[in-house]
Every structure is written in C-alpha cells, then in structure tokens.
A protein has these predicted regions:
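Conserved N-terminal beta1-alpha1 strand-loop-helix module at the mouth
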Residues: 1-80
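Well-formed, non-transmembrane alpha-helical positions, independent of function
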Residues: 83-84
C-alpha cells in the first residue's frame, strides 16, 4: 500500500482577516506545485467561514482547531460545539 503525505496547520490565536487572505493566496499558489500532497488548514473558529470561502475550488481542506468535548448544547462559555460548525 502506497503511503500518502498530508500537511496540516493551524493558526493558534494569530492572524487577522487581512493576514489570512494573504497567507491563503500564497498557500493556494504553492500547493499547486505538490498535487499529490493533501493539505488542510485549521483557523480559529471566527475565521472558518471566510477561510472556507477563499479556498472554494482549491484542494485545501478546512477544519476547526478547537471543538468542545460536550455532545449537547449548554452553558459552556467559550466552547464551540461540533454541531455549531
């Protein structure tokens, strides 16, 4: 079985919308050089929608870097339920 390469990265608590746009433009350009590599990014939750929109049509996948361990909604201040994403 052939092994494949996957590269993933997250922002931690860095960046702005402008920073993201610039970073993603460069990433989309560079990823084209490596078509056999799967790439995924995990921005902070507040940027997921904008990042996903900018990456429409590219092979780069988008995910969340933090998800609450709770399975049901509730009063968990600062947490993000997986279903909310």
């Amino acid at each position: 079985m052939k092994r494949s390469l996957t590269v993933m990265g997250n922002w931690k608590m860095n960046g702005t919308r402008g920073d993201n746009e610039s970073l993603l433009r460069e990433l989309v350009f560079e990823v084209k050089k490596f078509p056999s590599v799967e790439v995924a990014v995990f921005p902070p939750a507040v940027f997921i929608d904008a990042v996903a929109q900018q990456l429409v049509g590219s092979p780069i996948r988008v995910g969340a870097q933090d998800v609450c361990e709770q399975l049901k909604p509730g009063a968990f201040t600062g947490e993000i339920l997986g279903a909310m994403l």
